[in-house]
A protein has these predicted regions:
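N-terminal segments that cap or nucleate solenoid repeat domains
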Residues: 51-62, 69
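Amphipathic alpha-helical repeat scaffolds of TPR domains
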Residues: 27-40, 62-84, 109-130, 156-171, ...
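Short glycine/proline- and aromatic-enriched beta-strand/turn motifs that initiate or cap beta-hairpins
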Residues: 21-48, 56
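Alpha-helical adaptor scaffolds
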Residues: 92, 99-148
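Bacterial Sec-dependent N-terminal signal peptides
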Residues: 1-33
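Structural marker of alpha-solenoid helical repeat scaffolds
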Residues: 62, 107-108, 152, 189-192
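Helix-turn-helix repeat elements of alpha-solenoid scaffolds
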Residues: 42-56, 89-100, 135-141, 178-179
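TPR/TPR-like (Sel1-like) alpha-helical repeat modules
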Residues: 137-150, 157, 168, 173-195
């Protein structure tokens, strides 16, 4: 190995090491900002959730290639919407959530289980907005999205909690529990198992 080649090799090694350190530092900064914002939701109110959404959007602007800010924007928008299904801001938040989910679907390292969970939650909010009109329209979508989310990632706690809430809500509406046979009756397409999730 000549001196010039060796020098080039060292410079490239230093470059990649520096890049890795910068990326790690950026991820740590992003995680810290997200954590600070979510810490304000210990006792969530409509106002605090809206503030959290605004903060997450700013974080997303700072880290446009990251999934987590987008996930939190969608999740907190849905949390607000399910608490305030007929508030003036709700419809715009739901439209933005649809757009955010679409963006996440186009990012390679996005977790498909998380995407299914958010989509199921979105349809569930639509049912809460108008049970009579949207119940039959979105019922199957909610069921299938939560089941697919859990098929892709059985440890998805958010999907488990939302699915349970959905079953409880349907039981209250109909007076009958949604049993396993009913759930298995509905056709569903399961995507291939995802690769191990990479932190972003």
């Amino acid at each position: 190995m000549t001196f010039q080649t060796f020098k080039r090799f060292v410079l490239m090694s230093v470059f990649f090491m520096t890049t890795s350190v910068v990326i790690y530092a950026q991820q740590s900064t992003m995680q810290g900002l997200i954590g600070q914002s979510l810490a304000k939701l210990q006792q969530p109110t409509s106002e605090s959730i809206l503030n959290c959404i605004a903060e997450m959007k700013r974080i997303d602007d700072m880290f446009p290639d990251s999934i987590q800010p987008k996930f939190q924007i969608a999740l907190q928008s849905l949390n607000y919407s399910v608490m305030n299904p007929h508030a003036p801001q709700t419809e715009n938040l739901l439209k933005e959530t649809e757009e955010t989910i679409a963006k996440m679907e186009n990012i390679k390292h996005a977790d498909p289980s998380d995407i299914c969970t958010l989509r199921g939650f979105l349809y569930m909010v639509r049912i809460v907005q108008n049970p009579g009109q949207n119940g039959q329209r979105y019922y199957l979508e909610v069921m299938q999205d939560y089941e697919k989310a859990l098929k892709l990632n059985p440890d998805n706690q958010l999907a488990k909690q939302l699915q349970q809430k959905f079953f409880e809500g349907m039981k209250q509406q109909t007076g009958k529990p949604v049993n396993k046979k009913q759930r298995l009756f509905y056709p569903r397409t399961i995507s291939p198992e995802p690769k191990k999730r990479v932190a972003t």
